[in-house]
Amino acid sequence: MRTSQYLFSTLKETPNDAQVVSHQLMLRAGMIRPMASGLYNWLPTGIRVLKKVEKIIREEMNKGGAIEVLMPVVQPAELWEESGRWEQYGPELLRFEDRGNRNFVLGPTHEEVITDLIRREVSSYKQLPLNLYQIQTKFRDEVRPRFGVMRSREFIMKDAYSFHTTQESLQETYDVMYQVYSNIFNRLGLDFRAVQADTGSIGGSASHEFQVLASSGEDDVVFSTESDFAANIELAEAVAIGERQAPTAEMTLVDTPNAKTINELVEQFNLPIEKTVKTLIVKGADENQPLVALIIRGDHELNEIKAQKHPLVADPLEFADEAEIKAKIGARVGSLGAVNLNIPAIIDRTVALMSDFSCGANIDGKHYFNVNWERDVAMPEVFDLRNVVEGDRSPDGKGTLQIKRGIEVGHIFQLGKKYSEAMKATVQGEDGKPLVMTMGCYGIGVTRVVASAIEQHHDDRGIIWPSDEIAPFTVAIVPMNMHKSESVQKYAEELYRTLQSQGVDVIFDDRKERPGVMFADMELIGVPHMVVIGEKNLDNGEIEYKNRRSGEKEMISKDKLLSVLNEKLGNL
């Protein structure tokens, strides 16, 4: 490709509304341009990267035995009504009517469509298992699109769906897809973790997220320092170790009129925060027990996903309001605690090991100090309620936990029969009777993968693609002052034709631009290998080579240039 025949839309300045690095660099590199909130045009440089990412995904999916299909973006509402998600899905589901007043949606996902397709096309257990995938546009009407294509309203996804007669068959495909995803992200050159995850609105049982580690990520990824354990913070088990110490002081009632938060209590009374507990009041699952107290250590955070799995707690978790709390307990938030509490309480594992701790007295403006379980208050039910923190023991007993930010780029689920039962997707079983199919689903955010690669791999000059396979161009030819030097132009043209004939994805910068501008643009878009042709060096029989990833520069004899490039690229 010649730059003179290419839409090369780089920007010198960073747009003010771009907050994260990937958004900034994708705009500056001329990969995307905004059209409306959360909607983007993909320019030639962006499309080249996108198609290369898709190529890797297709190759690995095909190796894993998946078969490609293509399903409509526009989906009839009756399929969503049949699955039960028409009412469950929130406003991010874009609904509309056609000219015949029929209801449709713009698909945020395709479980309903694929289930409908398979129940029409597959009739016997002999046709299973099947694993079908597509790479298709999705639309979710995000309330606050942000971070460029990282969280846009329209995006491209690879979504796959597998169908089985048994849970064992699903597990086999799930394991294959886990490895396929690992292969994809390894080929992309990404530093990622496969983590245990919550199934969320998709539903189902087992689930893993594939998280690219990056400071701009929106998820907290927890992993062990010494083992393969990794989990989303929502799912990571908090292990409490040690034994509860014996009491050392008598419980006392203390006036605390100005201590309405844990931090105020700690500051005003010079207490160690790890010797305090906080009591959170949530709605109960049983109308006979409308409020439930959740008690965690003062420096810990409640894990709402874990808490709402307790049978006494309403799912989804909902906090009680001030009026409800005051009416039932007789005290306001900030003065609540375990002693003389008149509603069911659940305490975190760490709290169960505490002694001589401080908590609200359930009397406004008062706290109890030096509280001890069994002596001063009966031990409530113990449950894992908190988020893990760095330094906690790994749940598998190997090493301690680290926490980093992550960008979710892939997610695999064992759906089970959630959709197939609702939509009556059955086949004839071996015994001749109808058998409800068991399902799995497997998604990759293709456009998000591009952004996450940039988040993880860049410098102050621009993008550094982690793999040559996804760079928009593999080699850049930069002839200095070509339009003033016949020898430079002749050699550059010959090299360009040679590389093209050998299948190298090469960009030839034949613009009438200053060398500094040409260098800056090629570094900005992240071309991994740059060949710089100058008249003086050419007269000496040498060509300059620059490696974008390592920063390495070297002079190469022009007679050996192709063989050296062959070695560096590994594909000539």
UniProtKB/Swiss-Prot annotation:
SUPFAM superfamilies in the cross-refs: Class II aaRS ABD-related (SSF52954), Class II aaRS and biotin synthetases (SSF55681), YbaK/ProRS associated domain (SSF55826)
Class of the enzyme per the UniProt entry, highest EC level: ligase
Catalytic reaction list: tRNA(Pro) + L-proline + ATP = L-prolyl-tRNA(Pro) + AMP + diphosphate
Keywords recorded for this protein, A-Z: Aminoacyl-tRNA synthetase, ATP-binding, Cytoplasm, Ligase, Nucleotide-binding, Protein biosynthesis
GO cellular component: cytosol
Residues annotated as transmembrane: none
Subcellular location: Cytoplasm
E.C. number(s) listed in UniProt: 6.1.1.15
Domain of life, per lineage: Bacteria
Alphabetical list of Pfam families matching this protein: HGTP_anticodon, tRNA-synt_2b, tRNA_edit
Function noted in UniProt: Catalyzes the attachment of proline to tRNA(Pro) in a two-step reaction: proline is first activated by ATP to form Pro-AMP and then transferred to the acceptor end of tRNA(Pro). As ProRS can inadvertently accommodate and process non-cognate amino acids such as alanine and cysteine, to avoid such errors it has two additional distinct editing activities against alanine. One activity is designated as 'pretransfer' editing and involves the tRNA(Pro)-independent hydrolysis of activated Ala-AMP.
NCBIfam families: PRK09194.1, proS_fam_II
Protein name: Proline--tRNA ligase
